[in-house]
């Protein structure tokens, strides 16, 4: 792996795999380019490009749909362990760390964590429930983070969100809104995409996350294909705000969004380009695997060793590579959708 910086542009060259990565550390623009005549890389053999890191499982909202079942008794990841993770992440060539939880900004050493990540040459971001955003934290966010996201909680309180978003963006922070696509949000979001609320004026993008029935109830799953179709078609036509999806939504995107160029589509990146580290130092291909045997233990192995040699990661890569939908016209892009929770796939 070879690294070069041109201003805010980080260029990472993977010679053995015949591709390079262009990552703008200021804007977040990310491009993976294979060499002429070579296929797209299936995974990064050096280490994950992105790590989702849970630095706490503390959260006072205690939502019934929370897949981490975070609560007010949730534990914080010790700072000394975070330091060790960051050293190993830097050695593995990690480009971005997305902090989560729980509510990450309520970790008592959150500002110091942001500073340390950025000083390690890695770009931090985080998702918050909106609580505990002090001026000190927002100032640090504007200095160190590429972006931050606020999670959306129905019912929609316009006054609350407008006040919160005005405060955040007054610091010059690039702000995203994360919305879980589920039974009590899909119709509202379809309306928003057709008739933009004032909220959109403050957003860099709105990111939709497919609901996963982990730790919650399956009643939140949207299984009505007509509702899904109408929503994705509205997203396809929307020009009022930038729109993103998690890769768990791929089966819906390829079916109902016709204006998305294939080079902007990325199927499940778990164990291929990203990994999740829990606050108890277990490293999983995906955060939704917590509580399963699909992990490596950072108490006994290094981050890079787990990435390269762990059976959990090797087996999941193989599952993505081989468990495709034979005869499906979208197979080359979708790669079988979610290989861990088949029930979240939106195939008709």
Where are these regions (language model features)?
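N-terminal pre-core extensions flanking Radical SAM catalytic domains
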Residues: 1-73, 87-90, 262, 272, ...
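Short, acidic, Ser/Thr-enriched surface-loop or helix-capping motifs
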Residues: 25, 277-280
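Short cysteine clusters
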Residues: 59, 63-66, 268, 286, ...
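Residue-level recognition of short loop/turn positions
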Residues: 62, 101, 279-280
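Iron-sulfur (Fe-S) cluster-binding segments and ferredoxin-like electron-carrier domains
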Residues: 68-77, 290-295, 331-348
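Radical SAM/AdoMet-radical enzyme domain recognition
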Residues: 79-101, 106-213
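C-terminal accessory region of radical SAM enzymes
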Residues: 224-259, 282-335
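Short, basic/aromatic recognition patches
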Residues: 257-268
């Amino acid at each position: 792996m070879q690294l070069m910086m041109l201003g805010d542009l980080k260029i990472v060259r993977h010679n053995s795999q015949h591709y390079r990565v262009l990552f703008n550390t200021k804007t977040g623009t990310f491009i993976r380019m294979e060499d002429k005549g070579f296929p797209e890389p299936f995974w990064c053999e050096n280490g994950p490009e992105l790590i989702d890191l849970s630095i706490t499982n503390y959260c006072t909202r205690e939502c019934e749909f929370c897949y981490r079942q975070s609560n007010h008794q949730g534990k914080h990841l010790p700072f000394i362990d975070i330091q060790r993770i960051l050293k190993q992440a830097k050695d593995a060539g990690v480009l971005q760390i997305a902090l989560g939880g729980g509510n990450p900004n309520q970790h008592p050493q959150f500002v110091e964590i942001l500073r340390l990540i950025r000083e390690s040459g890695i770009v931090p971001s985080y998702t918050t429930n909106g609580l505990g955003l002090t001026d000190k934290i927002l100032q640090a966010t504007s200095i160190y983070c590429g972006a931050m996201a606020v999670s959306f909680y129905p019912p929609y309180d316009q006054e609350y969100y407008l006040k919160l978003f005005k405060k955040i963006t007054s610091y010059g922070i690039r702000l995203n809104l994360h919305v879980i696509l589920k039974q009590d949000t899909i119709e509202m979001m379809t309306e928003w995409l057709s008739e933009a609320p004032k909220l959109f004026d403050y957003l860099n993008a709105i990111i939709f996350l497919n609901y996963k029935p982990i730790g919650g109830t399956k009643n939140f799953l949207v299984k009505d294909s007509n509702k899904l179709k109408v929503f994705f078609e509205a997203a396809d036509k929307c020009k009022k705000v930038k729109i993103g999806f998690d890769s768990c939504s791929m089966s819906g995107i390829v079916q109902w969004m016709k204006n998305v160029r294939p080079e902007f589509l990325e199927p499940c990146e778990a164990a291929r380009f990203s990994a999740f580290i829990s606050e108890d130092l277990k490293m999983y291909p995906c955060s939704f695997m917590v509580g399963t045997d699909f992990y490596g233990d950072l108490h006994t192995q290094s981050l890079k060793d787990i990435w390269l040699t762990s059976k959990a990661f090797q087996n999941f890569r193989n599952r993505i590579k081989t468990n495709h939908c034979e005869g499906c016209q979208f197979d080359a892009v979708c790669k079988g959708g979610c290989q861990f929770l088949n029930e979240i796939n939106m195939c008709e």
